[in-house]
Structure formats: C-alpha cells, structure tokens
Amino acid sequence: MAKKIVGFIKLQVPAGKANPSPPIGPALGQRGLNIMEFCKAFNAQTQGIEPGLKLPVVITAYADKSFTFILKSPPASVLLKKAAKIDKGSPRPHLEKVAKLTRAQLEEIAKIKVKDLTAANMDAAVRTIAGSARSMGINVEGV
C-alpha cells in the first residue's frame, strides 16, 4: 500500500548550502520531518552543482514522518541574469534594455530548463526563455 501524503513543501534552497535555519527548519519542522536528514540528503545530491545557485525543491511529506524530494532546474531569471552578467533586470523592461543575449545563449538555458517547461519542442522552449528575457529588459537577438 502506498504511503499517505500529508502535504507538499516548495522551497528555493541554495545548492550545497542547506541548513536547519529558516526557511528550511520551520517549513519541515511544522510537518514533523527530520530537518538534518533533509539537509544532508539535499547537500549530497547537489554536490556537483555550482554552490549557492538557488534550486527549487518540492518536498513530499508522508504521514509516517518520512519524506522524498524532487530537485527542479534553477529559475529562468537566475540563469538569464548569469548569462547576461547582470545583477538584476530592468525596472522598466520595455523602455530600458540592460543586456543582450544571442539565440545560442538562450538555447543553452533552454537545454537546462526544458524538463521543467511545458514546451513541445526545443524551439518552443527557446521562445519561452526569450519571453522571460524580454520581460527582464534583456534584448534578444535571432528569435
């Protein structure tokens, strides 16, 4: 018989830097889950990823106080800012452009994000990422 699911917890945790402090501790503590067990498992699983890169994680909490978690790819905005070498997007994206990205750069980001997007193919994924870039005030070439 399958375990009874108590709930889902969605967090953004820096890769390799999970610790019991907020937001992880309180979120897991409310469900009675072992915080240190999650931190050790998360840090072990994110060992090969750039330290400090925020990763979305979905934790499934079960009635017997056990859990499983699924790592997602980093948010598109984080990857776009990294590729464009900027700290933040434009406060007025359609009036002020802060950077330029080429189609090749967007394809690299789309390859990372494609498993988390609902895009039917790679071209659709690139267009989705291009839309995110435009909404941040980044000029997109070749799309």
Swiss-Prot record:
Pfam families: Ribosomal_L11, Ribosomal_L11_N. One of its GO terms (cellular component) is cytosolic large ribosomal subunit. SUPFAM superfamilies: Ribosomal L11/L12e N-terminal domain (SSF54747), Ribosomal protein L11, C-terminal domain (SSF46906). Keywords: Methylation, Ribonucleoprotein, Ribosomal protein, RNA-binding, rRNA-binding. CDD domains: Ribosomal_L11 (cd00349). It comes from the Bacteria. PROSITE patterns: RIBOSOMAL_L11 (PS00359). One or more lysine residues are methylated. GO terms for molecular function: large ribosomal subunit rRNA binding; structural constituent of ribosome. GO terms for biological process: translation. Coiled coil: none annotated. Forms part of the ribosomal stalk which helps the ribosome interact with GTP-bound translation factors. Belongs to the universal ribosomal protein uL11 family. Part of the ribosomal stalk of the 50S ribosomal subunit. Interacts with L10 and the large rRNA to form the base of the stalk. L10 forms an elongated spine to which L12 dimers bind in a sequential fashion forming a multimeric L10(L12)X complex. This is Large ribosomal subunit protein uL11. The lineage of its organism: Bacteria, Pseudomonadati, Pseudomonadota, Betaproteobacteria, Burkholderiales.
